Amino acid sequence: MRRMIPTSFSSKFQGVLSMNALRCYVSEFISTFFFVLAAVGSVMSSRKLMAGDVSGPFGVLIPAIANALALSSSVYISWNVSGGHVNPAVTFAMAVAGRISVPTAMFYWTSQMIASVMACLVLKVTVMEQHVPIYKIAGEMTGFGASVLEGVLAFVLVYTVFTASDPRRGLPLAVGPIFIGFVAGANVLAAGPFSGGSMNPACAFGSAMVYGSFKNQAVYWVGPLLGGATAALVYDNVVVPVEDDRGSSTGDAIGV
């Protein structure tokens, strides 16, 4: 029995560092970098266009459109490689649902975090006249309320991801990412003025790291992670129960 333990551990470790797994991590890095660059950059762009006053409707509309388009594209370009997570909340939900292993999820998170920080650093270095914006909670909201709101938004987003990636629905490859982007854009429109409509811990982490302030950072982790995990459990166990032989089909569906 003692000989089987290191062998099993070694095989799992080799799987996490296999060439296919490394391709997934690189894919997540590229897609997350692109998304964060567009999502955070759109806020800086709207600030520039409106001379610093982003309190009007266009202050939310521009980032919402950018989030929708960038997320659709980011998910699409990595869909067949890594599953197009682009979001630690999605990765966490996939791990909770048993579609990826916990070690793989940790490497996904690492790729996503590094990509987010790098994207925000690029914005900081290239746009010298502005600081990198961070997600903030509106004055009329509490931290708990913002966490609940972010959790609900993440639930809707992750539920859409599970629906779009379900091979039993037979959706064309290009359709799923479009719907995922639509939901993200709608969520930003709905919650942008209140919590920022992040839904993505990596995006919030990268901007906070570069800006140098982690105030209320827990809001953008606890809410999305719990919301995403709940969506995974509800989809797989209540709405569309997964069959016993789901292992091979769902594995192919998310690209890992």
From Swiss-Prot:
The annotated topology with respect to the bilayer is:
Multi-pass membrane protein
Entry remark concerning the domains of this protein:
Aquaporins contain two tandem repeats each containing three membrane-spanning domains and a pore-forming loop with the signature motif Asn-Pro-Ala (NPA).
Q: Which UniProt keywords apply?
A: Acetylation, Membrane, Phosphoprotein, Repeat, Transmembrane, Transmembrane helix, Transport
N-acetylmethionine (modified residue): where?
A: M1
**Coiled-coil stretches noted in the UniProt entry, renumbered to this chain:** none
Family indicated by similarity = Belongs to the MIP/aquaporin (TC 1.A.8) family. TIP (TC 1.A.8.10) subfamily.
Organism name: Arabidopsis thaliana
**InterPro entries, alphabetically?**
Aquaporin-like, Aquaporin_transptr, MIP, MIP_CS
Motif window: NPA 1: 87-89
Q: Listed GO molecular functions?
A: urea transmembrane transporter activity; water channel activity
GO BP annotations of the record are: pollen sperm cell differentiation; urea transport
Subcellular localization(s) per the UniProt record: Membrane
Its transmembrane ranges are 24-44, 57-77, 89-109, 144-164, 171-191, 222-242
Phosphoserine (modified residue): where?
Answer: S249
Q: Which GO terms describe its cellular component?
A: membrane; mitochondrion; pollen tube
This protein's name:
Probable aquaporin TIP5-1
User: One Pfam family, short name please?
Assistant: MIP
Its job: Potential aquaporin, which may facilitate the transport of water and small neutral solutes across cell membranes.
Q: Where is this motif: NPA 2?
A: 200-202
What are the top taxonomic ranks of the organism? Eukaryota, Viridiplantae, Streptophyta, Embryophyta, Tracheophyta
